[in-house]
Structure formats: structure tokens, C-alpha cells
Amino acid sequence: MGDWMTVTDPVLCTENKNLSQYTSETKMSPSSLYSQQVLCSSVPLSKNVHGVFGVFCTGENIEQSISYLDQELTTFGFPSLYEESKSKEAKRELNIVAVLNCMNELLVLQRKNLLAQESVETQNLKLGSDMDHLQSCYAKLKEQLETSRREMIGLQERDRQLQCKNRSLHQLLKNEKDEVQKLQNIIASRATQYNHDVKRKEREYNKLKERLHQLVMNKKDKNIAMDVLNYVGRADGKRGSWRTDKTEARNEDEMYKILLNDYEYRQKQILMENAELKKVLQQMKKEMISLLSPQKKKPRERAEDGTGTVAISDIEDDSGELSRDSVWGLSCDTVREQLTNSIRKQWRILKSHVEKLDNQASKVHSEGLNEEDVISRQDHEQETEKLELEIERCKEMIKAQQQLLQQQLATTCDDDTTSLLRDCYLLEEKERLKEEWTLFKEQKKNFERERRSFTEAAIRLGLERKAFEEERASWVKQQFLNMTNFDHQNSENVKLFSAFSGSSDPDNLIVHSRPRQKKLHSVANGVPACTSKLTKSLPASPSTSDFRQTHSCVSEHSSISVLNITPEESKPSEVARESTDQKWSVQSRPSSREGCYSGCSSAFRSAHGDRDDLP
């Protein structure tokens, strides 16, 4: 366990300090100093006892040593070794009992000191072993701390490298996304270019096909001829003329002339139909522009005046470009594409505008909606059934047109033409035609889907327009009641209707109705102007006449309800009905209010049924 260490007891140290203090006060011999050192030392006393006493006390200094011991013991608190003498002059005698007691006490103290020393030494050994253990633990912990620091530094470096790698990967991902976007744009542009090239090639192919057909039909091949089997004779029983070159040439010429006449007749019909369709489409486009321009100014003036003017100017520019271009000189495909694109664009604008109006109407109706404003379910179901019937009719018409076109395309050709065409057609062209046919089917499906969505939007538009017309009629009624004298107007209108019932001449009806029309226009300046604009802007088709009937019916119903005139007074003459050719106007009134409502609803449904066929 190493060398023994000298550890001093604190009690002994304090006693030694006291001894040194007392000895410093008295004069001490060298032998006494040596004895003090022996007491303070840590060497065991049993080894040096004889030597110490041999040196300390001799036969010559017994008295001195006894006096010294007495003095020292008295300083430590022990009783004196001498007996107390009554007289100062008498000699003091040594007290053996006191000496023995002092020796016993000194021995007890020595034993206690030895036990304390042993306990201190064992404690010191324990503390030394604990210190060694703690030092070893400290060294181990220090090594662990160093290793953990190294690991932490390595992890920090790895984290830094991973962060740098992550940044580089993010940058690469961003670059890849940009590259993908560029490639997608390039692919889209190339796809559009490819579609244009395909259309151009199709046109060229059709032209070449027509040219080939003309060349084949005009060219005569003598080697190949067509024989007639199961020849049927004439009805009169006469024999036919002999076959000669002249008769065959004349018959072939007549056949070709008949075929050419048929082709020209069909071509004229198709051109006339195309011209009518072009007129209808252009008129529809103009009227849609006229419908959209006043309606879009109001909501867009509130939000952004600039955007509304730009959109309307774009529509007007498109219409101006179509009108400026020589539409009749262009081919059918280009005109059709231009018209369909422009109409689709205007239809989207109209759809967005209607959706905005729908949102505004839903907000207004959510605040205060009455049960009278809601359309009944039966009316809605009836309208849907009528629209479905009209859709089926349109489908049947489309199928009939397709059959006619197929019949026109599938004209009977000669054996010469069939053989040449079979030789000319290649496998690649057949595959390309199959691919185009699949694309056509997909486009047809998409067109049907869009058509359904457009029909639904048209139904919603019709319902909203009906609600709007009812609100407008109520508003006109209120304005009329607020701005005119009710009693005076009743008297004038009663006179007017009595004049209507008395006269059978339509001119008389028109003359009597003119001042009333002027009064109506002077009373409500805003709403009739809007209705006139709407009626003017609609296309000149059966739907426009029906729509005009609805407007006139609504205005008539509002005027009848304002003036409180009975249905008998409002009946016009039969001559006036015949002269107007079933066109309602301000002069001719329905037989009753219920008839007016039924006429409005039927005309409104027929108008929207025609609107559903839009692309």
C-alpha cells in the first residue's frame, strides 16, 4: 500500500501547542526538550522507553527530575506529586499514591492516543484507496469525454456534408423542373405544329384524291370493261340497238353527264347550307357580342374598368377581323375553325358572366328568399323532359346527316377506279387512317361531354333568365305605379280597350295602341330600352321570335296587372291575330293571364332548346 504516512491527531496537536507555550515560559533543560519531541513523535513509545528514561533520569538528578515531572504534571492538570507541608521551611515529601495515579492516567491517555492513531491510519488508508479509485474513474471519464467530443465533431462534420449535399440536390431538382417545363412547352408547340401539318397534309391528300378521281373518270381504258349480268329487256318488248363504238361512247357520255349533274346539284346544296350556317354563326356571334357588351360593363366598371374594356375590345376586334376577311373566299375548314374558336371564347365569357350573376343571385336569395320565387319541381321536370326530347331529335338529325354524307362519299365507282385505288392505298395510310379514326372518336366523346355541360349551363341560364324577367316585370309594375296617376290611367285604358273591342280593322288597333306605347316608354325609360336591345340582339331564327314573344308577353302581363283590366276587355279581334301571323306585340294581347304565362313558358323553353345546340 505504499509508505506509511505520519498523520497527527488534532487533539494532540493542540496539546503540543499548549505544551510549547508553557515550556517557552519556563526555563527547560535539553533533556526536557528531547522528551517533548519524543512525546510528539509518531514512533511507538515501547521501543524507546528504556532509552528515554536512561537518559532522562540519573542517580544524580533524581530530585530535579521529580521536580520537573511535578511541574509538568501540574501544568497538564494533574495533582502535585509532593505532599503539602504545613510549614514552608519543612522539606516536601514525595506522595507515592499521587505518583501512581498520575502514571495510570498517563498510561490510559497513551492507550487512547494509540487507538486514535490506529483509527486515523486505517481511515487514511481508506481515503488513499478511495482517492486512487476516484483518480482512475476520473481518467476513464476524461477518456470517454475525449471520445464523445471526437464523435460529436465527426457527426457535426457529417451533418454539414449532408446539408451541403441536400442543397445541391435541391438545386438539381429545381434545374430539372425548369428543364421539364421547357421540354413540355417545346412538346406542346411541336404538337400544335404537328396538328397543323397533319391538317395541311389531309387537305393535300383530299385534293390529290379528287384529282386522281377526275383523271380516272375522264380517262378511258379499252381493255377493261364492265359487263351487265341478267339484262332486263325493255318494257315495250323492242330489241335494243346494236352495240357500237358510237352508242357506247354516247351512253357513257350521258352517264357521266348525269353523274356530274348530280354531283353539281349536291355541291350547290351543300354550299347553300354552308352559306346559311355561316350567316347564322356570324349573326349569333354578333348578337352574343351585343348581349355581352352592355352586361359586362356594369360589374366590371365597379371592379376594373380597364379589364372589361379590353375584353370587349378583343371580342369586337375578333368580329371585325372575321368581317374584314373574305369569309366566302376561305375554305370551309378555316372558316369553321375561326367561327368555332370565336364562339367558344364568347361562350366561355358568357358562362363566366352567368356564373358571377348566379353567385350574386344566390347571395341576394340567401338574404331574403320567398317561396314564390322558387320554381316548382314539376315545371323543372317538364322542362328537362322537353329538353331531352329536343336533344334526341337533334341526335336523329345528326345521324341522318351522317348517313347522307356517307352515302355521298360511298358513291359507286368503276372497276378501273377501284383497282387503281386499291393499288394506290398503302398500309401506312391505312394505319394512319385508323389512328385518325380513334382520335376522331375521342374528340367526339369530348364533344359530347362538353355538349352536356353546355346544355346544363343553358338550363341554368334559362332558369335564371326567367327569374330575372319576373323580377323585372315586378319592378316595372312598381315604377309604373309610383310615377303615374293610377285613376286617370285606368279611365284612359278602359276607353282604349273599348275602342279595341269595337273596331275590327288592324290599322285602327295600331292607331289606338300608339299613344299607349308612347306613354309606357315615357314612364319607364330604362327597362323597355333594355328589352328592345335584347330582342334586337337575338339571332333571326325561330328561337328569336319565341324570345320576342316572351318579352312582349311579360310586358303585356305587367301592364294588364297594373291597369286592372278584365280578360274580356283585353281580347283582340280575330282580324288582328291573322294580320300579325302569330307574332305577339304590344297591340295584340293574350286571352287571359294564364294564357300569357303558358305562352311565355313555351316560348322560353323553345328558345333555350335551340340554344342548347351551341358548341
From Swiss-Prot:
It comes from the Eukaryota. GO terms for biological process: cell adhesion; centrosome cycle; cilium assembly; intraciliary transport involved in cilium assembly; regulation of cell motility; regulation of Rac protein signal transduction. Keywords: Cell adhesion, Cell junction, Cell projection, Cilium biogenesis/degradation, Coiled coil, Cytoplasm, Cytoskeleton, Nucleus, Phosphoprotein. The keyword Chaperone does not apply. It is found in: Cell junction, Adherens junction; Nucleus; Cytoplasm, Cytoskeleton, Microtubule organizing center, Centrosome, Centriolar satellite; Cytoplasm, Cytoskeleton, Cilium basal body. The modification Phosphoserine is found at residues 290, 293, 313, 319, 537, 541, 543. GO terms for cellular component: adherens junction; cell leading edge; centriolar satellite; ciliary basal body; cytoplasm; nucleus; protein-containing complex. Residues 568-581 have a biased composition (Basic and acidic residues). Residues 126-227, 266-293, 375-461 form a coiled coil. InterPro entries: Adhesion_Centrosome_assoc, Afadin/alpha-actinin-bd. Residues 293-316, 567-615 are annotated as: Disordered. Its main location: other. Widely expressed. GO terms for molecular function: protein domain specific binding. Interacts with SSX2 and SSX3. Does not interact with SSX1 and SSX4. Interacts with afadin and alpha-actinin. Interacts with VAV2. Interacts with PCM1. Interacts with WRAP73. Belongs to the ADIP family. Belongs to an adhesion system, which plays a role in the organization of homotypic, interneuronal and heterotypic cell-cell adherens junctions (AJs). May connect the nectin-afadin and E-cadherin-catenin system through alpha-actinin and may be involved in organization of the actin cytoskeleton at AJs through afadin and alpha-actinin. Acts as a centrosome maturation factor, probably by maintaining the integrity of the pericentriolar material and proper microtubule nucleation at mitotic spindle poles. This is Afadin- and alpha-actinin-binding protein. It comes from Mus musculus. The gene is Ssx2ip.
